[in-house]
């Protein structure tokens, strides 16, 4: 399937929700996992609280969170404990419905940059992965965009590319522990 949310730790990778194409196109609520050091197909982990695609995934070493999504647009954040198979639980909500933003984390703070709902967004929102609760606004990107990529290390998070409405090549960064508006990389 495609248009999934994903998150991982050093042992497991999780693939959540998305769209399946056989026998017909439909959204799914399934969560699958792989073991990083082994090859093979994904294995059933559990289910999301809702059927959704285009979620934004962030994680720590112990917890994965899947935020927002589409069909319909959603502000819901689900979470699972990565080491324990089972269904997702409610973590909290985004400040607004959103999908297809650029997610990243430093293992403590999960950040969602940009997105779409039903217009392109420039807001940056964050959660503390270890503490359930609603996301809060963190700053803004340099340009509204949907479908960007997100990546990070322990200090800096990057939101790159996307479309607004044509493809863009802008790379923004923030210092994860400080928040605030993004700076051009």
Describe the predicted segments one by one.
Residues 1-185:
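Polar, enzyme-active/binding microenvironments
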